Amino acid sequence: NMWATPDPIFSQAMCRVYNDYAWEVFGPYYDRLSPLACVATGDIDSAIAEIERCAKLGFRGLSLPCKPMWGPGTSEDANYNNPDFDRLWACIQDVNLPMTFHVSTGKDPRGAKGNGGAVINYVIHSLAPTAEPLVHLCSSGILDRFPGLRFASIEAGIGWIPWMLRAMDEAYEHHHFWVFPKLNMLPSEYFRLHGAASFQEDPPGVDLMEKYGLEGNFMWANDYPHHEGSWPHSEQAIERTMGGLSDPQREKILGANAARFFGFDVDKLLAYRSAATAQA
């Protein structure tokens, strides 16, 4: 984990080495693969420099940690709702790259020990913190100031997203005496316009997706090659989870949303697939 250090300069150095490797290996296949440029955000100046460098190389997206500084965190620590980060958001908007937040970043996901530790760590210390940067973006006025930003939660599932959207709106409306700044729309609307989330197998999430009309915000992934992913049985996993969806819904979730989010040319992808099939 390149972000597993309280030293943001060291973290950025690791990110830079990884980014060089990722572009060297996958850059030649730019039209069909999208390595994400990893960026440490604890030091804003070095983060901006790395984002600009990777954008010039040709990366299609960014991977940021769920919290700028590694560790348990306090209210005094730098966090994404702090106006100091406006320079970072301005840079990301200028290079026009989507940003993603992956599970198990920003804090140690091994916070629990003893009975049930593996489950507790996975649910509480790995998956749950992924909501934090999304709430920061949707509720603090960032997206009013930088309406070109796009963001996604990666590998944390989708069943919790409708709950999060409702919770943000409830706090904004019912606690309005204490809420600042006042936003141009409800927090949930920012997610619908700017946000996305990926999942592997999440039947409750798919059910809620249909109820709340979030087909345009969710992206399926197989998490290759991790053991919690669906590969090499992805076809069966898709049918288990999405067998009841319509073809237009499946088209969005299984590819169209991701192509739009990361800026792929679908015609080029289809042409490559046709050529590969013909050679097989």
Describe the residue ranges of each PLM region:
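Active-site gating/metal-coordination segments in enzymes
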Residues: 1-133, 140
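Mid-to-C-terminal alpha-helical segments outside catalytic/metal-binding sites
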Residues: 20-28, 49-53, 57, 140-141, ...
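Short, surface-exposed connector motifs at secondary-structure boundaries
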Residues: 30-35, 60, 122, 147, ...
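Hydrophobic faces of well-ordered beta-strands that scaffold small-molecule active sites
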Residues: 34-37, 62-64, 99-101, 151-153, ...
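Aromatic-lined glycan-binding groove of carbohydrate-active enzymes
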Residues: 99, 103-107, 138-192
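Short, well-ordered secondary-structure micro-motifs
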Residues: 111-112, 163-165, 208-209
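Short secondary-structure boundary/capping segments
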Residues: 117, 167-170, 234-236
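Aromatic-anchored helix/helix-loop segment that forms the rim or "lid"
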Residues: 125-133, 176-207
